[in-house]
Each structure stands twice: as C-alpha cells, then as structure tokens.
Amino acid sequence: MTPLSLIDPALSEQDNEHWLRFVALLQQSIAEDLQLPLLQLLLTPDERTALGTRVRIVQELMRGEMSQRELKSELGAGIATITRGSNSLKAAPPALKIWLEAQLLSADKP
C-alpha cells in the first residue's frame, strides 16, 4: 500500500502544522474516549451538523442511487457542497474508498 501524505497541498505550511496538531489531538482523545467532548468543545452545533451532512453526502455518492440534484433536495445541502464531495471522493486514495465503503455501506450501519 502506498503511504498517505501528511501534507495537505491546499493548506499553507503553518496551517498544515495546525491541522496535524488537531489530528494528533483527536487521535489521543479517541484513545482516551474523550472524542465527543473534544469535538463539542471545538465545533459549533452548525459545524457538527455540517460534518454529519458531509458524511451522508459521501455515503449517498458511494451508494450511487441518487443524482446530485436529488441529494440536494434530500439532504438540504448546496449543490456546490455536493460537487466538492463528489470531486474529493474521486480523488481519494483507493484504500480510503474501500474503508469508507465498509464503514458507510454495510447493511448494519445507520
């Protein structure tokens, strides 16, 4: 498997450092079962809702049963958000797509 790059080309060097610090903090919070209070501290209710919507967008795009316009109506998301999700999914590493499929498309997942 090809190692994933830790550097996000969309971010500046300093922003990458901040992002990686957040990821490390989140990983540590998961190890200590503190991820929910951490995310509630760092994210507003609207940001948490937006993340949930983005997960649903990725899930439905992977399922492939609805058009982007149908997703817009179903989820109340903007077409630009759905298009970004679609483009990001196309560019995602194959290993991530396989993992997401197992997480989001298995019959027993909510």
Swiss-Prot record:
Q: Where in the cell is it found?
A: Cytoplasm
Q: Which residues bind DNA?
A: 68-91
Gene Ontology CC terms, in alphabetical order: cytoplasm
Q: Which Pfam families match?
A: Trp_repressor (PF01371)
- Gene Ontology biological process terms from the UniProt entry: negative regulation of DNA-templated transcription
Checking InterPro entries in the record gives: Trp_repress (IPR000831), Trp_repress_bac (IPR013335), Trp_repressor/repl_initiator (IPR010921), TrpR-like_sf (IPR038116)
- Gene3D superfamilies referenced in this protein's UniProt entry, alphabetically: TrpR-like (1.10.1270.10)
Name the domain of life this protein comes from. Answer: Bacteria
Q: What is its main location?
A: cytoplasm
Which sequence ranges are marked TM in the entry? none
Q: Does the keyword Transcription apply?
A: yes
Q: Which UniProt keywords apply?
A: Cytoplasm, DNA-binding, Repressor, Transcription, Transcription regulation
- GO: which molecular function terms? DNA-binding transcription factor activity; sequence-specific DNA binding
PANTHER family this protein is in? Answer: TRP OPERON REPRESSOR
* Quaternary structure, from the entry: Homodimer.
Say which family it is in.
Belongs to the TrpR family.
Q: What does this protein do?
A: This protein is an aporepressor. When complexed with L-tryptophan it binds the operator region of the trp operon (5'-ACTAGT-'3') and prevents the initiation of transcription. The complex also regulates trp repressor biosynthesis by binding to its regulatory region.
- Please give the name of this protein: Trp operon repressor
The record lists the organism as Pectobacterium atrosepticum (strain SCRI 1043 / ATCC BAA-672) (Erwinia carotovora subsp. atroseptica)
- Organism classification: Bacteria, Pseudomonadati, Pseudomonadota, Gammaproteobacteria, Enterobacterales
Gene expressing this chain: trpR
